[in-house]
Amino acid sequence: MVKSGYQPENDIVFCLHGAEEWGSSYTQYDWTVGAWEMINHVHPEWVGKTLAFLNFELPAYEFGSYTSTYSAPEMFSMLDYFANEYAYSPDPEGCFSDGVLTEGYQTYTYSDDFSYYAAGVPSTVNGFLLQKDMETVFPFYEEIYHSQYDTPDTYNENVMKFNLQYYGALAMYIDQTPALYLDFTSQYDR
């Protein structure tokens, strides 16, 4: 983003956790403690000021023929518009042949974005874990993840390039939108 020469309207902070488990040792309850600590204790001032938290999990692996963005429900409409109507939203090339699904996929507790979402920050994560039904994990998690088969060979340059372009464009779109487009209809309907 810096190399592109883009001049943001708002501050853009790159927060590199490295893993949701950072920040706790010698406990079986390390899941997402680092992200929780970051938003609740290290930078609680981000709540109410942050337009969006864009999280990446395994951004260079092609899990299936499609991708999606999991998010807070109030972001579903904005993400649908961005993916399907916004002129500068990139399409996948050389990966995700079925494109970007935008039916509205709820964020969940398996990644850093949930801690930010729970604290009140509109949050997203690339669709990396669950399939369309939002109940079945991609086979990667049963066959490869955290095993001896999880090697550099899983890296897919086209997927990485797409995710950088797509979420970079999304960050710029959010930055340039005078008021963040949030739609609370799906929350109301629950």
What are these regions (language model features)?
Residues 3, 10-12, 130-189:
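His/Asp/Glu-rich mid-to-C-terminal helical/loop segments that flank catalytic regions of hydrolases
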Residues 1-29, 167:
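Alpha-helical metal-binding/catalytic segments enriched in His/Glu/Asp
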Residues 1-10, 41-49, 85, 89, ...:
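Secondary-structure transition/capping motifs at alpha-helix termini
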Residues 19-142, 156, 182:
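Metal-dependent peptidase/peptidase-like ectodomains
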